[in-house]
């Protein structure tokens, strides 16, 4: 058994080397450059779990094409409230990245973000009617101005020829398109942010697994960390801890013993994609094209055919195909889910199971799908696809939040959930999509909750980094145009 060989003391400890910890670390260095920061990551590099480009779809989620963010209500009206919120969040993230490029923290923006049209594509009368109504509702909003819509197959062919080639005529098709979308390599971005953190004085440790998180008698958090290569342990005593360990955040927050984590559970959903690198195919498609989710499918399982830019190379991705695994991390253990069950979240989890029979059936069906069935799903988007040109890859784990509702009930929540201790000394993030795209606003929100006495003093620096902070761009078209112009130039998107 390894023994504790040393102790360390830091103002801030970040657990996990993904996009959230990286974003928070850089933010804190801008706001409090004298604070000491340590980051511990279990794997050998930053951004290898959920942030890795092949473990997610790389969509800069701005609600331009994702139909689940703009549902139709019971009165037949498309509700764009959630879409507006997500779009505003991505503008905050874009401004943050732009400021980091301008000040030299990030180097070549092309290494992590590229302009790419975002499209929605459906077929059948009901779906086409919905997409028309969505287009009318969305295009009336300043942040979505410039959206195009067509039911003409030839126009859709001009936008994305693979969708039309070989498709039977007579089927009603509809597509909406916005040229302001992006593809993001969150793995590359994360690694650049962590490198910048280390260069600014943060202590970054890879191959270090956090095994314990308890409160010391003096109020500091004692973070027990195992050096996997050396077999030694260190206890890092920190004033503030952020648990940004992706799917691994729930077990660590449970170990902390904070009352705010009571009632929370995790529902892991695995995923696979089909990937094509054949240039003769890849060069015919330049868009992210999102469709409608199947009945009972979770939002992260909306099918989409995407252009990807990874390590300077273009490829296509189709999926995701959802599945179920009890791992909370791709590199985790099958015991992750059962070991997360506690008396305080058991009723939450049972109630969620009872109310989500359709989801369970859907996941079982997806798990049992053969490769041929997966190719059949691809053919619905790309009729002439040759299955031999596509390889099946396993994506990252998405641990959806199960949250207490009432005294004994529970609800399955899609999205992210910030959990903080009452005294602000500990914060963590649960959940998944849109996740990475909203890293900057989520981390700003976490800072406001954990350091309320500091926020007034930080306001000036935050507004230098994110000029629109505190404003709603959709209500201020002039500011929106200014932010778009500045960020397009800095990120080389124009």
Curated annotation (Swiss-Prot):
Recorded GO MF terms: 2-hydroxyglutarate dehydrogenase activity; L-malate dehydrogenase (quinone) activity
E.C. numbers: 1.1.5.4
GO annotation terms (biological process): tricarboxylic acid cycle
Principal EC category: oxidoreductase
InterPro entries in the cross-refs: FAD/NAD-bd_sf, MQO
Required cofactor(s): FAD
Keyword line: FAD, Flavoprotein, Oxidoreductase, Tricarboxylic acid cycle
Transmembrane stretches, start-end: none
Pathway assigned to this chain's UniProt record: Carbohydrate metabolism; tricarboxylic acid cycle; oxaloacetate from (S)-malate (quinone route): step 1/1
Pfam family, one: Mqo
Record has Nucleus as a keyword: no
Catalytic activity: (S)-malate + a quinone = a quinol + oxaloacetate
Entry similarity comment: Belongs to the MQO family.
Protein name: Probable malate:quinone oxidoreductase
Species of origin: Micrococcus luteus (strain ATCC 4698 / DSM 20030 / JCM 1464 / CCM 169 / CCUG 5858 / IAM 1056 / NBRC 3333 / NCIMB 9278 / NCTC 2665 / VKM Ac-2230)
Gene from which this protein is expressed: mqo
């Amino acid at each position: 058994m390894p023994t504790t060989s040393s102790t360390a003391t830091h103002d801030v400890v970040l657990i996990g080397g993904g996009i959230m910890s990286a974003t928070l670390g850089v933010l804190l260095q801008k706001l409090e450059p004298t604070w000491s920061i340590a980051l511990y990551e279990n794997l050998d590099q930053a951004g290898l779990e959920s942030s890795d480009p092949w473990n997610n779809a790389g969509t800069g989620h701005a609600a331009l094409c994702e139909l689940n963010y703009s549902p139709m209500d019971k009165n037949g009206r498309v509700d764009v409230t959630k879409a507006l919120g997500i779009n505003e969040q991505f503008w905050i993230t874009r401004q943050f990245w732009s400021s980091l490029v301008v000040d030299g923290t990030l180097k070549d923006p092309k290494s992590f973000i590229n302009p790419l049209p975002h499209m929605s594509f459906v077929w059948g009368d009901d779906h086409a009617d919905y997409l028309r109504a969505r287009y009318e509702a969305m295009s009336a909003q300043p942040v979505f101005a410039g959206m195009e819509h067509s039911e003409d197959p030839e126009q859709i062919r001009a936008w994305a020829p693979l969708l039309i080639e070989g498709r039977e005529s007579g089927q009603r098709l509809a597509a909406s398109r916005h040229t302001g979308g992006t593809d993001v390599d969150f793995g590359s971005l994360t690694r650049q942010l962590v490198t910048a953190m280390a260069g600014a004085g943060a202590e970054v440790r890879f191959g270090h697994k956090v095994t314990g998180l308890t409160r010391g008698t003096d109020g500091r958090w004692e973070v027990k960390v195992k050096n996997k290569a050396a077999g030694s342990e260190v206890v890092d005593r920190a004033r503030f801890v952020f648990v940004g360990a992706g799917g691994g955040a729930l077990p660590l927050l449970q170990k902390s013993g904070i009352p705010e984590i009571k009632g929370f559970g995790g529902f892991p959903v695995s995923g696979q994609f089909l990937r094509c690198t054949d240039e003769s195919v890849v060069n015919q498609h330049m868009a992210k094209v999102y469709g409608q989710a199947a009945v009972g499918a979770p939002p992260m399982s909306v099918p989409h055919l995407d252009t990807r830019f990874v390590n300077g190379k273009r490829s296509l991705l189709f999926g995701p195909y959802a599945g179920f695994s009890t791992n909370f991390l791709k590199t985790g253990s099958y015991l992750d889910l059962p070991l997360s069950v506690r008396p305080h979240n058991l009723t939450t989890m049972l109630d969620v199971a009872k109310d989500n029979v359709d989801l369970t059936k859907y996941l079982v069906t997806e798990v049992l799908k053969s490769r041929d069935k997966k190719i059949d799903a691809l053919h619905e988007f790309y009729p002439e696809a040759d299955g031999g040109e596509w390889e099946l890859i396993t994506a990252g784990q998405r641990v959806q939040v199960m949250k207490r509702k009432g005294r004994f009930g529970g609800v399955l929540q899609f999205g992210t959930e910030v959990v903080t201790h009452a005294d602000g000394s500990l914060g963590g993030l649960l959940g998944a999509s849109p996740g990475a795209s909203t890293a900057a606003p989520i981390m700003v929100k976490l800072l406001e909750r954990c350091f309320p006495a500091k926020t007034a003093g930080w306001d000036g620096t935050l507004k230098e980094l994110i000029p629109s902070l505190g404003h709603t761009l959709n209500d201020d078209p002039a500011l929106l145009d200014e932010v778009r112009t500045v960020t397009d130039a800095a990120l080389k998107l124009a």
